[in-house]
Amino acid sequence: SIMFWGISNEILIGGICQELVDTHHDLQKLCKELDPTRLTTIAHVSTTPTTGPMHRITDVESYNHYFGWYGGKMEQNGPWLDKFHAENPDICLGISEYGCEGIINWHSNTPQCKDYSEEYQALYHEYMAQAFEDRPWIWASHVWNMFDFGCAARSEGGVKGRNNKGLVTIDRKTRKDSFYVYQAYWAKDPMVHIAGRRHAQRAGETTEVKVYSNQDTVTLY
């Protein structure tokens, strides 16, 4: 089903000019003429100013943000959302892209940004899922990506030709721990998942057991 029409994606990467703004107004008008029943939206690149002529053209708006991966820290996402909302309470705001890479054979006891570990990816999505849960005024959030996917130009985490931001591996067979973060938030049926099962080689006398569940309590035997 078509839910809404997007008129552009990260268009300000190349800069802004009046012709660009005018074209977006023309596209908005055309969308409404062709289909007045659906909303229109735009996906702003992260560096797009929070005020300016590219805002309030479409019915709703979204940003592509990667704080905690390409730059900055994941904890910047919540404050940024709050600041934008305070400055623009009339704009219906969403997040059209967010994510970080996680490779299922990379693991860490001290996960951190850009280590490509499954553990860091899970921590990142734990934060983001809660950030959206705490802000009911966000109209939509779109994780990038459901599945790892091919990308010839990439060479990330020792893997060539693949973007590893998926919650599931490229062959659709292995659900990463980050997948179960969202299942714990959204699943109606009872679920439980013990994370870190692929992190088999660990140092130390004790280990932390992390569990994702939509139940109030779980018991580990």
Predicted features along the sequence, with ranges:
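Extended substrate-binding grooves/exosites of carbohydrate-active enzymes
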Residues: 1-221
